[in-house]
Amino acid sequence: MDKHPARYWHALDDGRIQCDLCPRDCRLHEGQRGACFVRQMEGGRMVLTTYGRSSGFCIDPIEKKPLNHFYPGSSVFSFGTAGCNLACKFCQNWDISKSRDMDRLIDAASPAEIARVAAEHGCRSV
């Protein structure tokens, strides 16, 4: 899957680009990735390295998620990908979120496909 153009960044006078998505304000040189490992400078622009790629898909009861009183009794279509700008030692997905191995992201689906499959399975949320 091709790398997807990213939003929320701007060019700097020194040839780098700055990510404006989170408070880390990563300033990247060509080929460099941000702290999240998801956003990269390529060809003078910001691209997403994991767009449309996932470490897996699953339908879960909403109660399994850290969402209090959100559609009680419903199902959620869950998926995950590598990349996170945090470094929480207690994170249950630390090995995935901090993975630098893009081969772990073996499943692929566009946002439209994810929404379609979630609706087909009666999931009220993604």
What is each residue range found by the language model?
Residues 1-74:
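Flexible, acidic/Gly-rich N-terminal and inter-domain linker regions that tether
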